[in-house]
């Protein structure tokens, strides 16, 4: 991802509806995991997820590949390690949790990253993974933020399972707004990562929050979430 895109992400993620609800989703997953331990946040970027981990009692290690992203994280008070998800600089079996939100789609050899996530987890440890869904939504936005692919359920579960993890759940997110996203990106000429009018931001946040209470997780969405464990 270009340095300018990373800077924009850091500027908007604290207030942007999409990032706020994604952090809420992470928090709900953390509450169901039980006793906190040592966690790795791959692709920490602006540090939003790292702060959620810390707030819930986890001891997070933030990892970034891009120098600009690592610098941004440090500027925001996050201790970050430079490293490659395909060759994690951590001991085998040393972690209780790995989060990788919007990471795998940037990596050509995503299967190597999946195997590394498995390697660094202890037996019984959990991986929480989020990726963009459905190549039908491919657009100039994906190209602008250096995506290699978008995933369907079978493709994502195959990569993670071959890496050695046991899948516990896979679900769609940002389902209700998928038609809006598809329409906008059809005519887009670049990244749609930008600030949002406060009134519109509040409305979009209300819509995506409503998904928590609706039976839509099996329907097509904009993002796929996956929870898995190391056997």
Regions found by a protein language model. Give the residues of each.
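A short glycine-rich, Lys/Arg-flanked "PGG" loop and its adjoining helix->strand segment in the class I
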Residues: 111-126
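Residues lining the SAM
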Residues: 101-104, 130
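C-terminal helical/coil "lid" or tail adjacent to the Rossmann-like core of SAM-dependent
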Residues: 177-205
């Amino acid at each position: 991802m270009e340095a300018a895109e990373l800077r924009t992400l850091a500027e908007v993620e604290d207030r942007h509806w999409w990032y706020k609800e994604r952090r809420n989703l992470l928090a709900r997953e953390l509450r169901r995991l039980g006793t906190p331990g040592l966690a790795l946040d791959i692709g920490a970027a602006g540090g939003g997820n790292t702060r959620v981990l810390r707030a819930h009692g986890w001891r997070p290690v933030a990892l970034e590949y891009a120098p600009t992203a690592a610098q941004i994280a440090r500027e925001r008070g996050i201790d970050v390690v430079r490293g490659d998800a395909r060759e994690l600089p951590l001991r085998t079996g040393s972690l209780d949790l790995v989060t990788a939100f919007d990471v795998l789609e940037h990596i050509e050899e995503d299967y190597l990253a999946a195997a590394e996530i498995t390697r660094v987890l202890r037996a019984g440890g959990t991986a929480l993974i989020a990726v963009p869904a459905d190549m039908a939504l491919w657009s100039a936005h994906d190209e602008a933020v250096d995506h290699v692919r978008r995933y369907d359920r079978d493709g994502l579960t195959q990569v993670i399972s071959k890496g050695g993890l046991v899948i516990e759940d896979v679900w769609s997110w940002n389902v209700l707004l998928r038609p809006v996203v598809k329409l906008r990106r059809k005519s887009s000429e670049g990244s749609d990562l930008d600030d949002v009018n406060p009134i519109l931001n509040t409305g979009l946040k209300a819509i995506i929050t409503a998904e928590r209470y609706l039976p839509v997780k099996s329907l097509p969405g904009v993002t796929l979430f996956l929870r898995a464990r190391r056997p």
